[in-house]
A protein has these predicted regions:
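Intrinsic disorder/low-structure terminal segments
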Residues: 16-19, 38, 62, 136, ...
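Beta-propeller blade termini and top-face loops
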Residues: 8-14, 36, 42-49, 93, ...
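Beta-strand C-termini and the immediately following turn/loop, strongest in propeller blades
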Residues: 1, 28-44, 53, 75, ...
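Serine-hydrolase catalytic core recognition
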Residues: 70-243
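Multi-bladed beta-propeller domains
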Residues: 1-27, 42, 51-70, 99-124, ...
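Phosphate-binding glycine-rich loops and adjacent basic patches that engage nucleotide phosphates
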Residues: 11-15, 33-38, 56-59, 179-190, ...
Length: 243
C-alpha cells in the first residue's frame, strides 16, 4: 500500500514506548506472519508487551505489569522476545518472554549481590479522587516505605514530583526514591493530571493550566497521606526535577 490511509491500532489508554533520543533508540516492532504486531507499551505507570491485529482491533497483553520496561528485541522465528525490565524492588535486568504463552524468565542478575546486602523500599500503590477537583480524575500515587518500617513509629515524608509535566512515575526501581527511603523517609510519588500513560484527556488536562489543578492534585495526595498515624505532618519535604 502507498501509506495514504493509515489505521490506528491502539487507543489512547496505551502509550507506545518510543525511546528518548538521543539517550536510547526506539523499541522494535514485530509484524508477525499471522498479522499480529508485537510492541512494548505503557498503561497507568506500568509496562506491558502487547499484541495488536494489523487490520485493527483490541490490543491484548502478552506479558508485563508492575514493572518499567525500556527495551525490546524480538526473534520472530523463535517466538521469543527479550526486554530490559525494572521492578519496584529490583533494578533492571534482561527477561526472556515466550510470545505464545507470556511465560518469562530472567536472564541476567547484575544486581543480586548488592540487593542481598541492601533491602529495597516497599512500594504501596493507591489512588485518590480530589473532592471538588476538576474533571473528577482518579490520581494514582506510589508510597515508598523505609526498609524495616514500623507502623508504631513516626516518619518524615518527602513528596517527589516528576518532570514534563507529561512524565510519569512507574512501578520501577528509582534510585532517588530508594536512597531517601533508606535514609528513613517515606517517599510519596504522585502522577497528577498531566502525567502520561493515563489517556489523552488526563494528559491534556494541564493545557493552559500548569501549576493549577495538577498542583492541587499533589497537595491532595499529601493531605491524604499525612492522615496516617505514622506520618509526621511537621516534617515534610519536596524533591523533584524539570517541571
Amino acid at each position: 500500500e502507498d501509506g495514504k490511509d493509515p489505521r490506528r491500532l491502539t487507543g489512547d489508554s496505551i502509550k507506545p514506548y518510543l525511546g528518548f533520543p538521543p539517550v536510547m533508540r526506539p523499541a522494535a516492532l514485530w509484524w508477525a506472519d499471522d498479522g499480529r504486531i508485537i510492541f512494548l507499551g505503557e498503561r497507568k505507570g506500568e509496562s506491558f508487551l502487547f499484541q495488536a491485529p494489523s487490520e485493527g482491533g483490541p490490543s491484548e497483553t502478552v506479558w508485563g505489569g508492575s514493572c518499567l520496561s525500556t527495551g525490546l528485541t524480538l526473534d520472530g522465528k523463535a517466538g521469543q522476545a527479550v526486554v530490559t525490565a525494572s521492578f519496584p524492588d529490583s533494578p533492571g535486568d534482561l527477561h526472556q518472554i515466550d510470545l505464545a504463552t507470556g511465560a518469562s524468565k530472567r536472564l541476567s542478575n547484575h544486581n543480586d549481590s548488592y540487593m542481598e546486602m541492601h533491602t529495597a523500599a516497599r512500594m504501596e500503590k493507591f489512588s485518590i479522587e480530589r473532592p471538588g477537583g476538576a474533571s473528577g480524575f482518579e490520581i494514582e500515587c506510589r508510597l515508598y516505605f523505609p526498609p524495616g518500617f514500623d507502623a508504631s513509629l513516626v516518619y518524615p515524608l518527602v513528596l517527589d514530583i516528576h518532570g514534563g509535566p507529561n512524565g510519569a512515575f512507574y512501578d520501577a526501581f528509582v534510585p532517588a526514591q530508594q536512597v531517601l527511603a533508606t535514609a528513613g523517609y517515606l517517599v510519596l510519588a504522585v502522577n497528577p493530571r498531566g502525567s502520561s500513560t493515563y489517556g489523552a484527556d488526563f494528559m491534556m488536562a494541564v493545557l493552559g493550566d500548569w501549576g493549577g489543578e495538577d498542583y492541587l492534585d499533589l497537595m491532595a495526595a499529601v493531605d491524604d497521606v499525612v492522615q496516617r498515624t505514622y506520618v509526621d505532618a511537621d516534617r515534610l519535604g519536596v524533591h523533584g526535577y524539570s517541571y
